[in-house]
Amino acid sequence: MNGLILFCAVVFATAVCTYGSDAPCLRAGGRCQHDSITCSGRYRTGLCSGGVRRRCCVPSSSNSGSFSTGMVSQQCLRCICNVESGCRPIGCHWDVNSDSCGYFQIKRAYWIDCGSPGGDWQTCANNLACSSRCVQAYMARYHRRSGCSNSCESFARIHNGGPRGCRNSNTEGYWRRVQAQGCN
């Protein structure tokens, strides 16, 4: 039914049905279910249609898997991922004039610049392998053009501030947050 579901529940012998979309939960990498069912990760509220006990289960296993390989080290990717989302597929959030989505809080323009992997921006951003592949491709495209060094600091600041982010003083605070995750 194209993301639109009919949810019915029997409450005190009365059927209650609601129409709605589970798309916000799916974009967050989760699955809508009744909260009496064990969740292999954590429940998030407000992302599912239906009653108040129908919540989004975002599995902790969605965080497992590996980062794409490339010029950005695995450790550096992990630090950036932790700063952006706690390294979870957190869906999309409004940030500086547009939505930022997923593990690395990737904006649509960033996804286009990295070559549009995965066929769909939001799906890619909420997939660890695809989103890290996008970050690797973005760095391969921009880090030398802007005269930035091949360092985690440059990669983090470009990720935060765009192609010339390593030279922008506005990204220094972001770099300190990445450093606090154990990267240098």
UniProtKB/Swiss-Prot annotation:
GO terms for biological process: defense response to Gram-negative bacterium; defense response to Gram-positive bacterium; killing of cells of another organism. The keyword Transferase does not apply. Hemolymph, labial palps, non-vesiculated cells of mantle connective tissue, cells of interlamellar junctions and epithelia surrounding the water tubes of the gills. Residues 1-20 form the signal peptide. Activity increases as temperature increases from 0 to 45 degrees Celsius and decreases markedly at temperatures greater than 55 degrees Celsius. The active site is at 84 (proton donor), 95 (nucleophile). One of its GO terms (cellular component) is extracellular region. Its main location: secreted. Optimum pH is 5.5-6.0. Residues 69-184 form the I-type lysozyme domain. Disulfide bonds join 76-152, 81-87, 92-101, 114-134, 124-130, 148-166. This is Lysozyme 1.
